[in-house]
From Swiss-Prot:
The lineage of its organism: Bacteria, Pseudomonadati, Pseudomonadota, Gammaproteobacteria, Alteromonadales. One of its GO terms (cellular component) is cytosol. PANTHER family: DIMETHYLADENOSINE TRANSFERASE (PTHR11727), DIMETHYLADENOSINE TRANSFERASE-RELATED (PTHR11727:SF7). It comes from Shewanella piezotolerans (strain WP3 / JCM 13877). It comes from the Bacteria. Keywords: Cytoplasm, Methyltransferase, RNA-binding, rRNA processing, S-adenosyl-L-methionine, Transferase. This is Ribosomal RNA small subunit methyltransferase A. Gene3D superfamilies: Ribosomal RNA adenine dimethylase-like, domain 2 (1.10.8.100), Vaccinia Virus protein VP39 (3.40.50.150). HAMAP family: 16SrRNA_methyltr_A (MF_00607). InterPro entries: KsgA/Erm, rRNA_Ade_diMease-like_C, rRNA_Ade_Mease_Trfase_CS, rRNA_Ade_methylase_Trfase_N, rRNA_adenine_dimethylase, SAM-dependent_MTases_sf. It catalyses: adenosine(1518)/adenosine(1519) in 16S rRNA + 4 S-adenosyl-L-methionine = N(6)-dimethyladenosine(1518)/N(6)-dimethyladenosine(1519) in 16S rRNA + 4 S-adenosyl-L-homocysteine + 4 H(+).
């Protein structure tokens, strides 16, 4: 049998499907998720239910978002899950997660995410951070390193800044390729993201922060002065006590927020 087939389902490359099969890893992830009935439990990409089954076993209801129609049909007829699941068939990248929030109940979101959509999905989920208690995701190890990176490192970038603006980021465990069917070509890791109830460095307009960080990191080898010359002047960098000759990966989240807020203030006055 092909190593792309697991439980009778052939992994689809276009959906980035790699199914988690290692029981020890599954148990550790479920322990980190800590399922309960006090939150709206949401799984993205349940696949063949490796996490779905143990999470659902201890709670009354689990909401899942799955793109693959064949997998949705399997879940609808699953002997132990079908009565516990609220199934949404569709693309998580376009899904309105706010609709899942119930009165006085925030979401706990988790999943073994398709690696080909993990970065855009992170940005999409950050839009709903105020409704989320925490998130646990299996990702490429490289993406987890980017999420948790410090300024001055190669992994530090736009994703780092936006993730750490919205959330505390904590790597949980590393997972080798042999824990999956089919084995991915890269190492994986689980990360815990806890959205801030109160932002340590509040930005007046998050869209401006996103635009500024995207602009800054578009050319990593260039200086801030070069990359942000259409947004901030040398005098404004001096006002913020930021060295404009530094490269974008040398600037902290707090400094990016300060630059965005100054730019917003300038636009408001003009």
């Amino acid at each position: 049998m092909s190593n792309k087939v697991h439980l009778g389902h052939t992994a689809r490359k276009r959906f980035g499907q790699n199914f988690l099969t290692d029981e020890n890893v599954i148990n550790r992830i479920v322990g980190a998720i800590s399922p309960d009935n006090e939150h709206v439990m949401v799984e993205i990409g349940p696949g063949l239910a490796a996490l779905t089954e143990p999470v659902a076993s201890g709670i009354d209801k689990l909401t899942v978002v799955e793109l693959d129609k064949d997998l949705v049909e399997r879940l609808k007829t699953h002997p132990t899950l079908k009565d516990k699941l609220e199934i949404h068939q569709g693309d998580a990248l376009n899904f309105d997660f706010k609709q899942l929030v119930r009165e006085d109940m925030q979401m706990k979101v988790f999943g073994n995410l398709p690696y080909n959509i993990s970065t855009p999905l992170m940005f999409h989920l950050f839009e709903f951070a105020q409704y989320i208690e925490n998130m646990h995701f299996m990702l490429q190890k490289e993406v987890v390193l980017r999420l948790s990176a410090s300024p001055g490192t190669k992994a530090y970038g736009r994703l780092t800044v936006m993730a750490q603006y919205h959330c505390q980021v904590m790597p949980v465990l590393e997972v080798p390729p042999g824990c999956f069917t089919p084995p991915p070509k890269v190492d994986s890791a689980v990360v815990r993201l806890v959205p801030y109830k109160t932002k340590p460095f509040p930005c007046k307009d998050v869209e401006v922060l996103r635009h500024l960080t995207t602009t800054a990191f578009n050319m990593r080898r260039k200086t801030l002065r070069n990359n942000l010359k259409h947004m901030l002047s040398d005098d404004e960098f001096a006002q913020l006590e930021i060295d404009s000759t530094l490269r974008p990966e040398q600037i902290s989240v707090q400094q990016y927020v300060a630059m965005a807020n100054l730019f917003i203030d300038k636009q408001t006055k003009s």
